[in-house]
Amino acid sequence: PFVITSPCIGEKAADCVETCPVDAIHEGPDQYYIDPDLCIDCAACEPVCPVNAIYQEEFVPEDEKEFIEKNRNFFRNR
């Protein structure tokens, strides 16, 4: 699945939300999150993000890896 990382914090542009064909992207208090159970890995969200915050999980930069777990926890705690 795809993961939204730190550049989204405070930005929350929502272009990704409108683009996602399966409504897997949800708004959190500080950023958007991608539901890993709904994400179909279509990558539609990645190029529309104006702050380049979206990565395929295996390509999340090393200094952003914490967002993989943060993303999972967002949906685990819902």
Swiss-Prot record:
Query: Pfam families of this UniProt entry?
Result: Fer4 (PF00037), Fer4_4 (PF12800)
Give an example GO molecular function: 4 iron, 4 sulfur cluster binding
Domain called 4Fe-4S ferredoxin-type: residue spans: 2-29, 30-59
Q: Which residues bind [3Fe-4S] cluster?
A: 8, 16, 49
Q: Which UniProt keywords apply?
A: 3Fe-4S, 4Fe-4S, Electron transport, Iron, Iron-sulfur, Metal-binding, Repeat, Transport
Q: Report residues binding [4Fe-4S] cluster.
A: 20, 39, 42, 45
Cofactor-binding details, from the entry:
Binds 1 [3Fe-4S] cluster.
Record's keyword annotation contains Metal-binding: yes
Q: Which cofactors go with this protein?
A: [3Fe-4S] cluster; [4Fe-4S] cluster
Residue ranges of the TM segments:
none
Briefly state the protein's biological role. Answer: Ferredoxins are iron-sulfur proteins that transfer electrons in a wide variety of metabolic reactions.
Q: What is this protein called?
A: Ferredoxin
Organism this protein belongs to:
Alicyclobacillus acidocaldarius subsp. acidocaldarius
